[in-house]
Structures are given as C-alpha cells and as structure tokens.
UniProtKB/Swiss-Prot annotation:
Transmembrane segments: 22-42, 72-92, 99-119, 135-155, 208-228, 238-258, 278-298, 303-323, 328-348, 396-416
Annotated pathway: Cell wall biogenesis; peptidoglycan biosynthesis
Gene Ontology terms: biological process: cell division; cell wall organization; peptidoglycan biosynthetic process; regulation of cell shape
Record lineage: Bacteria, Pseudomonadati, Bacteroidota, Bacteroidia, Bacteroidales
InterPro entries, sorted: Glycosyl_transferase_4 (IPR000715), PNAcMuramoyl-5peptid_Trfase (IPR003524), PNAcMuramoyl-5peptid_Trfase_CS (IPR018480)
UniProt GO MF annotations: metal ion binding; phospho-N-acetylmuramoyl-pentapeptide-transferase activity; UDP-N-acetylmuramoyl-L-alanyl-D-glutamyl-meso-2,6-diaminopimelyl-D-alanyl-D-alanine:undecaprenyl-phosphate transferase activity
A cellular component term, taken from the record's GO annotations: plasma membrane
Name of the protein this chain belongs to: Phospho-N-acetylmuramoyl-pentapeptide-transferase
Function recorded in the entry: Catalyzes the initial step of the lipid cycle reactions in the biosynthesis of the cell wall peptidoglycan: transfers peptidoglycan precursor phospho-MurNAc-pentapeptide from UDP-MurNAc-pentapeptide onto the lipid carrier undecaprenyl phosphate, yielding undecaprenyl-pyrophosphoryl-MurNAc-pentapeptide, known as lipid I.
Family matches, as Pfam families: Glycos_transf_4, MraY_sig1
Length: 419
C-alpha cells in the first residue's frame, strides 16, 4: 500500500519518495517492521492467550523438563502470521501474482492450523483436526499454486544457456523472449536446469501438457510434505522457528538473484521477472520468525502450535516452487526432512516387524528425531539405535540442529556454482 502512496508522491516530486522503488530499501524496512511487530505485539498476544487459558496440553513421554511446559500458551503462530502480513501488505506490490500467492498461502494454512489448535484447546481433543482434512487443505493449496503458475500469463521466465569457448563457459546468455516453462533449478546438470517435460519422450503440445501436469503434481507433494515436516519439527523450544529463519534467508537471496539478470547470469540460473517482490515477503518472514524466537527460545513463553508450523512449512514450499528451487529443498530443508522421515521410517519399521514377528520393533528410541536425543540409551526402550547413551539437554539439541541447518543452507547456495 505504501508503495502506491509513495509512487504518487514521487509524481509530485516529493524528496525521498523514490526510495520505495528500490526493493532493497523496502526489504530492509520489511525485516525491521516484522521484527518490531513480533516483539511488541507478541507480548500482548501472549498475555491474551494466557488469560484465555489457551495453553498446551502435554502428554507424559518421560522427557526431561517436559511437564514444566504444561499450560504454556499456544496458537502463537498468530504472532508470526500478523508480523508477515502487515509488512507485506504495506511494502510489497499487491498487483504481483507471486505476492498474492504468498498471501493466500499464509492465510489458508494459518487458518487450517488455527482450526487444528482450536479443536485441541477448546474441544479437548489432543489429536486436533483429523489428518485427512489437513491433507485435503495442503493438497488443495498445492493444486491451486500449480494451476496458477501454469495459467497466469504473468508467470514467465527467461531461459538461460551457456556460451562456450574452448570447452569453457565464457558467459551465460538469456533468451530475449519471456516464456511459460516447466523448468526448475537443479545442480550438477547442464545450465543448472531440468525440465519436467523432458521425463517422457513426447513432442509438441503433448509434451508441454505433460510437463505442467507433472509440475502440478510436484507442487502438491512439495507443499504437503514440507508443511507436515515443519509441523513435526516443532517439538523443541525454538527449533522450528530458528530453522525457518535460516531457510528464509536463503530463499530471500534466491528471490533477489533470480530477479536480477546479471546475478542470475553469474549463477547460471533462470531469470524470473517479478520475483524481486518476493524478497520483501522473505525478509518479512525472517523478521517475523526472529521476533517470535524472542519468546519461543528455551524456555518458551509461547508455542506456535499448528497455526505457525503448518504456515511456516507451507510458505517455504510455495516460495521455493515459485522461484523454481523446489529441487534444492532436500538440502535446504534438511532438518525438516530428517525429522519427517524419522517418523515415517519408525512407523514403517514398527509395522513391518510386527507383521513378521508379532512384535513391533523400533529404529529410534523416540520420534521425531529430536526426541531420540532426549532419551538416554538405558531408558529400557528396545530400539536399534541406542546412541547417544546420555540424554542431551533440549537447548543443546536445538542449537545443534540450527548449526546443521546453517551448514546445509551454505551448501544449498554453493550448489548453484557447481558444474
């Protein structure tokens, strides 16, 4: 909104009004504003949640310090959502299709998570919203994102190709024409590009249609999987919040370089016109998560609940799809994914061994993976992996997972220059 106001003021030749035309300036304002909003309104929202007795119910899993969390306010994801949306609405261009998709993602998954938390708190159902309804919401969002990216005429890219001399890359050339494309960025392949339409040996319109059908299916899987993995990661104070902030920084960098033709040329990635506005959203996302971490760090004064975790995961997934970096998520979202996979592997192995031997066995002492490190090796749990033998304090597990996230974020950026 402020963009349009200052655009009008610039026409009146108001000194300094042109600043709002610079994405870098608006991004800087966005992160500061989001950070201030999260810290200032966060305290007030926490007090209201506490007075309304909107507290977390805790199951006794035998974890150190677990029962002390009972009654801690939940639904704190509202702080994150508000702190993302207000800077975005004020500073970003609202005629940009990518910004509109991110706003829809934030509101839709925020509402889905809020409904889940509401059922847990007020209807006293620990399982919350039935899993099938969560999946329907996530699949529906992924389908919407895929279809909009397919059908909206503003969603285009400029394809890149290498110009070689003596077998060496001399420069990267961008085609003048902006095209609809099912290409995505992936390291270790020619031009760092991979086209979904090339999977099957098809030609013409059939090939194009197949590429978009596959892209929509990938969008559905990515949104559903990453949002659920983020939800499972939110089990230790500050873990999901800090990990999301790290991922958000990388996504902000990707959005900026993808919309800057010289930087895109240097990194040999596709140029995406209009993606620069996503930088503002990403900085608001980072500011909101860091601000929320002020209250969510150990010992947490508030939990984000599904209101926050589903939203964070969905935002990361949709953002990556828009800037065509979804194939980098296994590296960038490594912490989220190993948390989710640990649960899937545990359930699969338990059911498999129970069917074969009549007694279910475990690989990990407890899942998601962060709980495995909270359990000592002599806890009497029959699990294939018993190390570490000593329980690790919650705060140390969180910091170590953050460090892993930072390392994987650096590797993600580095892959763009690998040939």
């Amino acid at each position: 909104m402020l963009y349009y106001l200052f655009d009008y003021l610039e026409k009146l030749q108001l000194p300094g009004a042109r600043l709002f035309h610079y994405v870098s300036f608006r991004s800087a304002v966005a992160i500061v504003l989001a950070l201030l909003l999260a810290t200032v309104i966060g305290n007030r929202i926490i007090e209201r949640l506490r007075k309304a007795q909107i507290g977390e119910t805790i199951r006794d899993l035998g974890l150190e310090g677990q029962l002390s969390k009972k009654g801690t306010p939940t639904m704190g994801g509202l702080i994150i959502i508000i702190s993302i949306l207000i800077p975005t609405l004020l500073l970003a261009r609202l005629d940009n299709v990518y910004i509109l998709l991110m706003i829809v993602t934030t509101v839709l998954l925020g509402s889905l998570g809020f409904l889940d938390d509401y059922i847990k708190v007020f209807r006293k159902k620990k399982e919350g919203l039935h899993g099938r309804y969560k999946i329907i919401g996530q699949v529906g969002l992924g389908f919407i994102i895929g279809i909009v990216l397919y059908m909206n005429p503003a969603v285009v890219i400029k394809e890149n190709s290498e110009v070689l001399r003596d077998g060496q890359v001399e420069r990267v050339h961008f085609n003048k024409q902006e095209v609809k494309s099912t290409k995505t960025t992936i390291p270790f392949v020619k031009n760092n590009n991979f086209d979904y339409a090339d999977i099957l040996p098809l030609e013409g319109k059939t090939k194009v249609l197949f590429g978009w059908i596959l892209f929509v299916c990938v969008a559905v899987v990515v949104v559903t999987f990453i949002s659920n993995c983020a939800n499972l990661t939110d089990g230790l104070d500050g873990l999901a919040t800090g990990s999301s902030a790290i991922i958000g920084v990388v996504l902000a960098i990707f959005a900026y370089v993808s919309s800057h033709i010289e930087m895109a040329s240097y990194l040999n990635i596709m140029f995406i016109p209009g993606a620069e506005e996503l930088t503002i959203f990403a900085f608001a996302f980072v500011g909101a998560t860091i601000g929320f971490l002020w209250y969510n760090a150990y010992p947490a004064q508030v939990f984000m609940g599904d209101t926050g975790s589903l939203t964070l995961g969905g935002i990361i997934a949709v953002f990556a799809l828009i800037i065509r970096k979804e194939m980098l998520l296994p590296i960038l979202c490594f912490v989220f994914i190993i948390e989710g996979l640990s649960v899937m592997i545990q359930v699969f192995y338990f059911k498999l061994t129970k069917r074969r031997t009549g007694e279910g066995r475990r690989i990990f002492k407890m899942t998601p993976l962060h709980h495995h490190f909270q359990k000592p090796g002599n806890a009497g749990i029959d699990a294939w992996l018993q190390k570490p033998m000593q329980a690790i304090p919650e705060s140390k597990i969180t910091v170590r997972f953050w460090l892993v996230g930072i390392i994987m974020a650096a590797i993600t950026i580095a892959t763009l220059k690998m040939r």
